[in-house]
Amino acid sequence: MGEGVNMEIYNESILWDEYFDALEKRNYEKALLLIDKILEVRESPDVYVRKARILRTLGENDKALEYFDKALKLKPKYILANFLKGALLVSLGKLEEAKEVFLKLCRLEKSDLPVKYVTAFILKKLGEYDYALKIIDKILKKYPKSAIAWAEKGEILYREGKLKKSLECFDNALKINPKDCQSLLYKGEILFKLGRYGEALKCLKKVFERNNKDIRALMYIIQILIYLGRLNQALEYTKKALKLNPDDPLLYLYKGIILNKLGKYNEAIKYFDKVLEINPNIPDAWNGKAIALEKLGKINEAIECYNRALDIYE
């Protein structure tokens, strides 16, 4: 070894080479041992963050949080450490703690768009809609063509019951990104709730064309077709939905309602009974069965079913 070489730096360099090699081979236990050796040579926030990330990969989340905190003790405004700590807290469902981390990040001058998005997401999950909207409006002021921000704003307004304002936001999101199925689904739901069934059906069918396993879109399509009296089509979509989700009592209920409307009362009763086998406390199933029994002239049985429905409603 030549004169003037700092052995400590040389040894650390070897450790880093071995560490990156272990990471590449996904040998996380070895990488962790090497990080500990590096920490013996040099304590730094970057190294603590690396250790925290390995611990998270290994599922040792509490220890990972401990090392993110060690990094932040040395460098409180370390954006990456704050972000990763906050993201871990979100994944653990610790939203209040995550909120504090991301609000701190938002106050930093260098906070970027992902930070603001995640902060708004957390606030939305916590039901702090006004605060979330303030952050989203700041994003939209700077990035008016952010489809994600328009969609987030639309979802919050939807949760607040402000359907027309929410619809405007989803329309803006879809102008920017027409392939956004989630925004299209929300648009369909809103149009349905506003009684604009034809427009809603068009949106929801587009969602289903793009993703034929979207049960939520199917549920709304079935309801709309029932409202529009297009019963045979509703029946076909119900069959498709039952293939995807054969244990959903609501689908059996829809099928029973459709069969009742088609005058197929004996078949309808079978489906209402299936609903009641899964959950005997669904009043609409008792009510639907009562209607079918009444149409079949089985008045006493119908009265009994009506009474069961009334007991649940009360």
Curated annotation (Swiss-Prot):
Keywords: Repeat, TPR repeat
Family annotation (SUPFAM superfamilies): TPR-like (SSF48452)
InterPro entries (UniProt xref): TPR-like_helical_dom_sf, TPR_rpt, Ycf3/AcsC/BcsC/TPR_MFPF
Keyword Repeat: yes
Keyword Repeat: yes
Annotated signal sequence range: none
TPR repeat extents: 12-45, 46-78, 80-112, 114-146, 147-180, 182-214, 215-248, 249-282, 284-313
Pfam families in the cross-refs: ANAPC3, TPR_1, TPR_6, TPR_8
PANTHER family on file: CELLULOSE SYNTHASE OPERON PROTEIN C, TPR REPEAT-CONTAINING PROTEIN MJ0263
Name the UniProt record assigns to this protein: TPR repeat-containing protein MJ1345
Lineage: Archaea, Methanobacteriati, Methanobacteriota, Methanomada group, Methanococci
